[in-house]
């Protein structure tokens, strides 16, 4: 039987291609769509959004709704990156990882 992750943390960024130099409107809309997902915590950073959930499916849903949002805004090409840290041995939140790194 597969072990269920205690918490999954992911770094996600999305970039509409061909929409000009500033993409803040599109990124803001994507973040708004992510904020509606129950059971998903997020932290916006200057270069990406960090996602946290005990359910990997919620993180993948955030990617899906972000792409759908940008398509609705007229983006004809979308590039995104997703880096996932799924820890199974003990619970670690975004805040725990930051505290650990700072010492």
Where are the regions that the model predicts?
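Charge-rich, low-complexity N-terminal segments
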Residues: 2-103
């Amino acid at each position: 039987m597969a072990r269920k992750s205690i918490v999954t943390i992911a770094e996600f960024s999305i970039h509409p291609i061909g929409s000009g130099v500033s993409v803040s409107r599109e990124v803001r809309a994507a973040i708004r769509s992510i904020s509606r997902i129950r059971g998903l915590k997020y932290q916006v950073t200057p270069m990406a959004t960090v996602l946290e959930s005990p359910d990997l499916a919620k993180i993948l849903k955030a990617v899906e709704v972000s792409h759908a949002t940008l398509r609705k805004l007229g983006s004809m090409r979308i590039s995104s990156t997703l880096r996932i840290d799924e820890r199974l041995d003990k619970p670690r939140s975004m805040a725990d990882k930051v505290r650990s790194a700072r010492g």
